[in-house]
């Protein structure tokens, strides 16, 4: 039990956990930037909370009706007017600069990605297409990803988060994910990767990611898409670059060949 607790404290958190309050561990620079921005804004939030609380407590203490039935009237205070104008203007500036920097960096698209993957949302499963790989009949490598029913889960697998076919990607490689639906609006969201891209009918949205460490990352559809909206999870498995080719060709290609 002791070793299990130690493992849970040092192991990355890449899936939703019961009673979870914080973020999942970052696996991309984008998610790390989101976490850092949250901490920076939270610092200013604490400052404002302490300052406003002090003013309220001081006002309640010094202007109690029993001690001072006639409150002191301050007609004008130049210093107070200047301070309460300058500081509320400076704080949003310190928040806006890193916010816009992160926002624009999230919209940047890699010009020449190493791999392009197309994620197509359905009711209620997903189809993934590796556009860089073609089979013998010149068709792109394509496979479907369905939720594993609760009765078929193996020991250690997460309920409503595991799929039969994972998205296998190489770690520390620039990837482009193209997201689109086949029917109604969907969304492709993986918290550990800092990714949430809406799938809008008739449009192709794209995002660029670079997974910095090996692991298995879980996500879900973040757009209400119908009755089984909660049963369309996303599982991304990042493997070392040297193992990526064998994983794709040994696991995915036989599946597509069998379906054909």
From Swiss-Prot:
Topological domain spans for side Mitochondrial intermembrane: 1-39, 105-260
Entries under Pfam families matching the protein: COX2, COX2_TM
Membrane spanning stretches: 40-61, 77-104
EC number assigned by the record: 7.1.1.9
GO terms for cellular component: mitochondrial inner membrane
Residues that bind Cu cation A1: 186, 221, 225
Miscellaneous comment in the UniProt entry for this protein: The gene coding for this protein is probably silent. Soybean nuclear genome encode an active cox2.
Family from the record: Belongs to the cytochrome c oxidase subunit 2 family.
Subunit field text: Component of the cytochrome c oxidase (complex IV, CIV), a multisubunit enzyme composed of a catalytic core of 3 subunits and several supernumerary subunits. The complex exists as a monomer or a dimer and forms supercomplexes (SCs) in the inner mitochondrial membrane with ubiquinol-cytochrome c oxidoreductase (cytochrome b-c1 complex, complex III, CIII).
Mitochondrial matrix side: 62-76
Lineage: Eukaryota, Viridiplantae, Streptophyta, Embryophyta, Tracheophyta
Chain's role: Component of the cytochrome c oxidase, the last enzyme in the mitochondrial electron transport chain which drives oxidative phosphorylation. The respiratory chain contains 3 multisubunit complexes succinate dehydrogenase (complex II, CII), ubiquinol-cytochrome c oxidoreductase (cytochrome b-c1 complex, complex III, CIII) and cytochrome c oxidase (complex IV, CIV), that cooperate to transfer electrons derived from NADH and succinate to molecular oxygen, creating an electrochemical gradient over the inner membrane that drives transmembrane transport and the ATP synthase.
Cofactor binding annotation: Binds a dinuclear copper A center per subunit.
Membrane topology of this protein: Multi-pass membrane protein
Record's catalysed reaction(s): 4 Fe(II)-[cytochrome c] + O2 + 8 H(+)(in) = 4 Fe(III)-[cytochrome c] + 2 H2O + 4 H(+)(out)
Protein name: Cytochrome c oxidase subunit 2
Protein keywords: Copper, Electron transport, Magnesium, Membrane, Metal-binding, Mitochondrion, Mitochondrion inner membrane, Respiratory chain, Translocase, Transmembrane, Transmembrane helix, Transport
Localisation per UniProt entry: Mitochondrion inner membrane
Cofactor annotation: Cu cation
Biological source species: Glycine max (Soybean)
């Amino acid at each position: 039990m002791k070793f299990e607790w130690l493992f849970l404290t040092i192991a990355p958190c890449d899936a939703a956990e019961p009673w979870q309050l914080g973020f999942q561990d970052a696996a991309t620079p984008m998610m790390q930037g989101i976490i850092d921005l949250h901490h920076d804004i939270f610092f200013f939030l604490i400052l404002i909370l302490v300052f406003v609380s002090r003013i309220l407590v001081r006002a309640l203490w010094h202007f109690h009706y029993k001690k001072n039935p006639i409150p002191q009237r301050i007609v004008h205070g130049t210093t107070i007017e200047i301070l309460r104008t300058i500081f509320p203007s400076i704080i949003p500036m310190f928040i806006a600069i890193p916010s816009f920097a992160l926002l624009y960096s999230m919209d940047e698209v890699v010009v020449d990605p190493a791999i392009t993957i197309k994620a197509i949302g359905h009711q209620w499963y997903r189809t993934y297409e590796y556009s860089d790989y073609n089979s013998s009949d010149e068709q792109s490598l394509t496979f479907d990803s369905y939720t594993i029913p609760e009765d078929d889960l193996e020991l250690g697998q997460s309920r409503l988060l595991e799929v039969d076919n994972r998205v296998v990607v190489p770690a520390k490689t620039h990837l482009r994910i193209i997201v689109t639906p086949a029917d109604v609006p969907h969304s492709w969201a993986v918290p550990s990767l800092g990714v949430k891209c809406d799938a809008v009918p008739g449009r192709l949205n794209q995002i660029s990611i670079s997974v910095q460490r090996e692991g298995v990352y879980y996500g879900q559809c973040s757009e209400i898409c119908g009755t089984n909206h909660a049963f369309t999870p996303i599982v991304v498995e990042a493997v070392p670059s040297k193992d990526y080719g064998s994983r794709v060709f040994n696991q995915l290609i036989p599946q597509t060949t069998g379906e054909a």
